[in-house]
Amino acid sequence: MKIFSWVQRKLSGKKRVPTSDSSQEPSSPPLSKEVQGLPQDEETFLAIGTLGNNIFPKQEEEEEETDSSKDITPVNTDVTIGKKKSLSFLLKKMFVCTSGFKTPPPLLDLSRGDSLHNTRMEKMLRTILNKKIHPQRSNSIAKKYLESNHKIMDEARSSVDANKWVKTDSECEIF
């Protein structure tokens, strides 16, 4: 009940009337320097120590004046804005309607005949086609490396063969 009375006081903007006598004020411990600068009214503090709405009353009045000066028609609370639904709409849908909530639409468009298998096949075909159109150059580089490696090996073999002693020269006899 205290919560409802607190909310009602906040909405109406009235201050709380203390129920105890003013002569019997409880003695409070001395406040620190940080707390002394803040207003000591109970109404200005909310839970978690944030300041209430009584601190800036002039700004609220100015905002109300600017809002009232605009020619805006009042908005119906049952109107949906974007994906937000009003509470009354949700309650009606949940309790009154027998069908309840609709299931969310599937991710695949079944009207086109899509299925999970078809989308996977399309994805695989797309990747294969993409690889055929834009092949990686690693194959041609490897071929060039192997060709140059064979040339180097052939040159090395030929240089080794050139240094061999040919027996035909030694067979030649001088008389």
Swiss-Prot record:
It comes from the Eukaryota. Disruption phenotype: No visible phenotype under normal growth conditions. Roots of plants lacking LAZY2, LAZY3 and LAZY4 exhibit a negative gravitropic response, and grow upward in the opposite direrction of root gravitropism. Specifically expressed in roots. Expressed in root tips of young seedlings. A motif (IGT motif) lies at residues 44-50. Coiled coil: none annotated. The keyword Hydrolase does not apply. One of its GO terms (biological process) is regulation of growth. The keyword Transport does not apply. InterPro entries: LAZY. Keywords: Growth regulation. Residues 9-39 are annotated as: Disordered. Belongs to the LAZY family. Involved in the regulation of root gravitropism. Functions redundantly with LAZY2 and LAZY4 in the control of root gravitropism. Functions redundantly with LAZY1, LAZY2 and LAZY4 to control plant architecture by coupling gravity sensing to the formation of auxin gradients. This is Protein LAZY 3.
